[in-house]
Amino acid sequence: MALKHYNPTSPARRGLILVDKSGLHKGKPVKALTEGKRKSGGRNNQGHATARGIAGGHKQKYRIVDFKRRKWDQPATVERLEYDPNRSAFIALVKYEDGELAYILAPQRLAAGDVVLAAKKTDTKPGNAMEIGQAPVGTIVHNVEMKPGKGGQIARAAGTYVQIVGRDKGMVMVRLNSGEQRYIRSDCMCTVGAVSNPDNANQNLAKAGRNRWLGRRPLTRGVAKNPVDHPHGGGEGRTSGGRHPVTPWGKPTKGARTRHNKATDKFIIRSRHAKKKR
């Protein structure tokens, strides 16, 4: 779907660029496939604020999306594409031959009336799901499992995808959007195609209120605060902070590595940080 550029008929419209959603379903979601969703406001179970910048936003219903795609060898027809407030990608309502309805992540170039299939091995057609070991080398896939049966975890955001680059000893080598190359078990499921709504990143919301509708609060820079409130605070006039970027609690941020998982390090062939090391 294309981007929609608005005319500056008011200050709030100047520079406004949004994704054109005219091709999406305009009604409500399927009630049986929705759940209630309570906003946390960035608070944990003790009421303490653990995530800053989260508050308010429009009330949302959670859509139950099938990330597992384990209903094998049963064709499903795409009824319609829908907006989902819980994710950046669009979702597709599919109807199986036995009448069951389900939501799946909508890949690019999927339209109402298309037939999708999940099987151990199937055609490389957008929306079809199969074991990643059965897909040809070079295939673009998304919604990739990391453990068989757990459901897709990699490449679920708008416009993302994974490319299969090779096979080795029952494992499949894939390249992620970040540049990382890693092994994935060949019996993990994946869905063919790239995720829909690739223009999501090119939107310009044009006004603060539109961010508030999405539940995002303003973020105050550390250098604009007092020394009592942030390690970057204080100084006479405008200062640059004087140290590597840190959080208000002094922990490194903006590119500092936080991954500590020796058990799965062996599956990473090439780190996403490899370019930085040179």
From Swiss-Prot:
rRNA-binding keyword on record: yes
Keywords: Ribonucleoprotein, Ribosomal protein, RNA-binding, rRNA-binding
Disulphide bridges: none
Disordered as annotated region, ranges: 28-56, 221-278
Biased composition (Basic residues): 269-278
Cellular component GO terms held in the UniProt record: large ribosomal subunit
Role of this protein: One of the primary rRNA binding proteins. Required for association of the 30S and 50S subunits to form the 70S ribosome, for tRNA binding and peptide bond formation. It has been suggested to have peptidyltransferase activity; this is somewhat controversial. Makes several contacts with the 16S rRNA in the 70S ribosome.
Subunit structure: Part of the 50S ribosomal subunit. Forms a bridge to the 30S subunit in the 70S ribosome.
Name the record gives this protein: Large ribosomal subunit protein uL2
Organism: Rhizorhabdus wittichii (strain DSM 6014 / CCUG 31198 / JCM 15750 / NBRC 105917 / EY 4224 / RW1) (Sphingomonas wittichii)
Top-level taxonomy: Bacteria, Pseudomonadati, Pseudomonadota, Alphaproteobacteria, Sphingomonadales
